[in-house]
Amino acid sequence: TRKAFNKIKFVVEQNVNVVSTAEEMSFPMAQEPELSAEMDKLAKEHGVSILGTGINPGLMMDLLAICLSGCMTDVEKVTCRRVNSLSPFGPAVMEEQGVGLSVNDFNTGVENGTLAGHVGFAESVGMIARALGWNIDKFEQQMSAIVTSVDRKSPYGYAKAGDVAGVNMTGQGYVDGEVKIDMVHPQQIEPEMEGTHTGDYIVLEGSPEVNMSVRPEVDGGIGTIAMVVNMIPHVINARPGLKTMLDLP
């Protein structure tokens, strides 16, 4: 959000609506409440709207769970799991996810912050919590290596046996000291080579329990393009201000 702010500000000052794919923009108030308020004020002054969206965050691990909760009288816990393949992605993603690194180099990258892993858990947790009326008192996330036992090669990535084929991201949102939102997101190149099948899964504990399974995964690249394009008319027709997927049809 902070890195994207100046670009968004420039566009808004030209009286143009903005749809951003920056992950943190999906629910920027989760980590940047003051900057979010500034963007909202700026958008209203110029009569335009700002929205951040994508496939994840933006749909598969947040909005979809929120929509599914609409058939429930009581929600006790939300678990979202997205198992996806990194194979279609290019060199930048391979580097961000640590594909091809030794385990030691991967762990060093996690410690010094040079590996991005998945970005957006804080925003997804914040969006779900806002929709369900929960107050998150603690958020945590973890990042661990997925080590391959066979050589794996994708168009832009290579990991030899014993090295890192991807990253397993996990995150938790706590309410009153209890994990109420659980996020699990393993992503790797050529997952099928070791029997891992991609998919999107949501479990909502409560009354009645909801268990959703989509296999294979919803394609991240095409899905993000579709989300952005499909939201354009809604952003154009929205009242001015900073919006999230909770605000729009």
PLM regions: where:
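Short, ordered loop/turn segments at secondary-structure junctions
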Residues: 16, 22-26, 55-56, 83
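Active-site-lining helix/loop region of Rossmann-like oxidoreductase modules
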Residues: 69-200, 218, 225, 230
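C-terminal helical cap and adjacent loop that interface with cofactors, partners, or active-site loops
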Residues: 189-249
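Rossmann-fold NAD(P)-binding glycine/threonine-rich loop
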Residues: 3-5, 9, 13-14, 22-49
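Alpha-helical support elements that line or immediately flank enzyme active sites
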Residues: 59-71
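Generic secondary-structure signature for well-ordered alpha-helical cores
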Residues: 40, 44, 48, 69-73, ...
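Active-site nucleophile and cofactor-binding loops and adjacent substrate-binding regions
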Residues: 53-58, 220
